[in-house]
Amino acid sequence: MYINILKNNTSYRILASDIKYVKILCENIVIKTKNKIYKVRCDSTNLIKKLKIYGFVNSSENCIINLKYVKYINKLYIHFIDGDAILLTYDKYKEIIKIIKPKD
């Protein structure tokens, strides 16, 4: 699945599986992929709904992550395979741990 975004009158088509995380900063959205960072303005609600279908989860109220790029999680940060790290809220930490830890 591809996500279509518009930036400076140029349309970009991003493969959803290439997206590591999406941060919502006021009216701006930062989309971090394996190779690039996009800073755009678009409807974050629809974008988040689309990405959740593909296994993305919220790490805070303003950030959604792709678990396939996560190396490890502690109570404060999510650490990605490439060395990036983003803040994690405690409530979301508990939710994500339930998702990634298999039940006995």
Say what each PLM segment does.
Residues 1-104:
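Basic, polyanion-interacting recognition surfaces, primarily
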